[in-house]
Each structure stands twice: as structure tokens, then as C-alpha cells.
Amino acid sequence: MLALLALVLALAGFSACSGSDEPGATQSPGVVRVAGGLISGTEVDGVRAYLGIPYAAPPVGDLRWRPPQSPDSWEGVRTCVRYGPSCPQPLGDGLSFFPLGETDEDCLYLNVWTPGAVAEGDGTGGAAEGTTDGAADGAADGAAEGAAEGAADGAAPLPVMVWIHGGGFSTGSGSLDVYSGIGLARLGAVVVTINYRLGPLGFLAHPALSAEDPSGASGNYGLLDQIAALEWVRENVAAFGGDPENVTVFGESAGGMSICDLMVSPPAEGLFARAIVQSGPFDSSGAGMDAVRPLAEAEETGRELSRRLGCDEAPDELAALRAVPVGRLLRAAERTVPRGPGGLGFVPVVDGVVLPGDPAALFAAGELHDVDLLVGANADEADLFLLGMRGATAAQLTRYVRRLYEPDDDAVLELFPDDEHGSRKAALSKAVTVMGFLAPARFAAASVAEAGADAYLYHFARVPPAVGDLGAFHGLEIPYVFGNPVLVLDVTGGVDGELSRAMMRYWVSFARDGDPNDGVGAAAGTGSETASGDDEAADAALPSWPAYDPAS
């Protein structure tokens, strides 16, 4: 049971790496020039990894609750072989299965994985010579020469996949072991994972913050971080062999919700061509969660937090709030925001600027960016959320349903009767899964297709033996997408290995040109085409995946 609980917590996004190097990494002198200066990374299984790259200035002090700023430049070559700190988040001792490792407000870092064969044109030779004798100029010259050599080779730029992690907008990190991009990079993609501000640091609105900002709004600092990371990718990913005009954002849970927000956000337009949304509906009311909040409501929450912290009577309220130690801020925030059954607290804000309206309504109206979409959910999403209700009585579960779905609770109980699902708990799990995840995923696919872009819909139903009596719960698909084992769940061999390789190939093919049915063997006749040349990865051609038809 402990192993199962640990697996569930890991996939729910509660565990982050402690800032260590990639397993099996050997330090490489390969040097790449990015905004800010020169960086070197590591090589793991033939893939170059650059970890802990700053994409924005530390959002600390006076930069707390401000849009992300450009990072400071540095002299010489910055060694990027360790993950940066995760963003502060409220994790208690009860989750000691996975120590979070280092957290810090200085957390706006990203990680890049790129196939070594592509990254060879990064100035390795000249850079190594330059850094050996301490000459930064030599490193820069080497980088330029290497880049020119890479361009001369005529290698086509690779598709770029940017992962936005989940965690209810309050927990998580881009540096989880399960998010390592090695496997996807070996299939021919440049993979980027990012951190963004969470909880009250990422999504606090307050009238004084709105008045201070030229836009007249506040509350979407976490989304602005994601946009800043995408801008960094557009400006720098070519140095890693990636195509800045061929970027796919993909994410799960709150990461998927974020992507839906970005698909209707004016500042994000043009920063990505495709999106993959895993179990991240833009409208999560069917799961008892408010994925966005109106600005006025969010500002009132900010007022209450300030009162709770004793900052509302200060001569300079914002200065007082910015001086509050982060631990105290997080504890006060947990007491300030009433959490519904779904568990979301601080969330993105409909501010009229970053989010011009409710994303669900904008999708329905076709007011979204021209972005191809691959979207889906798992067969038993809610089994994770109901894990703590194993011993609940039918009466307790009924009260939960009524609280979750009022004033439509009677209709829900009628639509999902116990006798059709075996028990009240099974019926509740199906209700939350269908209304909170499966139906919104289908609606998102239909909205995109009706707007004229391509959409593909999936349904993940695999239940590996390692999960016991749980079904295909929320987050279970993540190890399959990245090809990374998690504790007792091994996705590298057997049936689960085959499924993982298939999903990875579909995902990378979609990232390449918006069609999962080509590129790395996802269509008949192309089954042997893999970037890695790995016989195990070069399975037979996968079944054809038809585009979503709203009429179906």
C-alpha cells in the first residue's frame, strides 16, 4: 500500500528532484550561446541536457508580483548541469515519501534536452579551448564556429516540445524525474520543461497591484512566466537545434488548463503552433474546481490575505506584503482561500488582459488562436481524488455529491446511478471523470475543429498491475508519455513499454507537423523511422489515428 501511495503522490506532482544531476550524466564541454551568455551542459544516453537555465530574473523583493523581467547576463560559461530550485509551495511533512528538495522564490528556470547529433554544432571544440585557459572570448568564438558548422551540415531544425507541469497551480516543478526529456529527445524533438510561480506568488490579485500595473490588472504572474518561457524558447531554441517556428506546448492537469488559457491569451499568440492537453480541461467545474476566477473576486481574496497578514494597515501595503517571508505567506494563503472538493486555491484570473474572458466561453465562441490540438483524459481520473474516501459510507458519499454539484446534485445522482456502476463511490468517480475531464476534452476538440484547426482526441484506459485496484487515475499517463519509470511502475518493457513507445511516437509526430500519423512511424509504412535508431523503439507501424470529427 505504501508503494502504491508513493506512486500516486509522484504522479500527482508532489515530488521534485532535489537539484541533482541527471542520472547517468557525464559533464560535457558543449557550449551554447543563449540570451544572457554562454552555457555548458551534460550528455546522457546520447542526449545533451542543459539544466537550470534562467529564463527570467529572480522574482524576489520588489519583483514579487510583477511580470517576469529579463535575466541578468553573466561572464564566461555558466555550467548548467543541475536543476534550479522549485518554486515555493505548501507541502507538509505528510508527503515525506518525496522530499521536495530546494525551493526558492528565485525559481524561474527551465531545462532543455536535445539530441547530441544536433547539438554537436554548438562550438564544442573552440569553446573547450577557450574555457580551458579562462578566455570567455575563446568560448564565444568556438560557439560561433560550431554553430556555423552545424548550419553548413544542413540538418533540418527539430520540433520543440515545451512541457508545463501540473499540480493545481499550487504545487509541482518542471524538474521531476518523470519529466526528463531524454526519451522524447531521442525520437527527434528538443524538449523543454519549465518552472512557473505557484499559489499566491503566481496568482495573487489585489486592487493595489492592479493599480500599480500599467495594464490595470493583476493575478496572472504564473501565466506570464509561462509566456516569458515561451518567448525565451522562440529566441534561443535554435541554438539547441530546435525550430522556433515549430513549438508545441504540452501539459497535464493544471498544465493543460494553463495551455487552454494560453490558447485564448493575446500575449501568447504566435508563440506555439500546436498544443497537447492531458487531463487539463479549461472548464473543470464538473470536477468541483474553478479553473479561473473573475478579477474582482480574486482581488477581494488578495485583500483578505493582506488583512490576515496584518499588512492592510501598513503605510505602504504592497511593500509590506512583498516583505512577508515566503513561508508565512504560504501558510496564510492556505487559510485564506476556501478550497472546494476539487482542491484548487489560487488560480488564473480573468483580468481582461492576459485572460480576456472565461476560456470555456471563448472556446465555445471560436475565439482562440489557430492552434492544432491533441487532447484527452484518463478513464478513471477521479479515482485519485477519491483515494481518501475508501471507507466512506454511501450517505457520506451522497453528501459529497450534493456539495460538489449543487444545485444540480439531484440530476447528477440520477444520471450516474449506483446500480449501473456497482457502488455509490464508483458512480461518483465516473461522474467526476466524465463531467470534469472526458466531456470537456471532447468539447475542446470540437471547438478547435469547428474553428478550422486539426484536433485529435484520446482516451487513456491502461491499468497496469502496479496500481492495484485503482483504475486509470489522474496523471497515470505521464510516465508513458515521457518513457520514464516511476517507482513500481516500469514503462520500459512488456505491454507498458509498448504502450509508452507508441504514445511517445504519436506525441512527437504530432509535434512535428500537427499529425500524429507520420514522422516517427505512426502511420502505415513508416514504422521503422525513429530518430534514435533504437531497434526496440522502432516498432511496427501504429494504428492510424483519425482527426476528430465534430459530427461523430
What are the language-model segments listed below?
Residues 17-130, 142-220, 489-506, 511-520, ...:
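Non-catalytic accessory segments of hydrolases
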Residues 92-128, 149-314, 353-388:
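Serine-hydrolase-like catalytic core of hydrolytic proteins
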Residues 114-121, 237-246, 311-315, 447-456, ...:
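Surface-exposed helix-capping loop/turn segments at secondary-structure junctions
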Residues 3-13:
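Bacterial N-terminal signal peptides
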Residues 183-184, 264-268, 467-473, 548-550:
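Short glycine-biased active-site loop of nucleotidyltransferases that positions the nucleotide triphosphate
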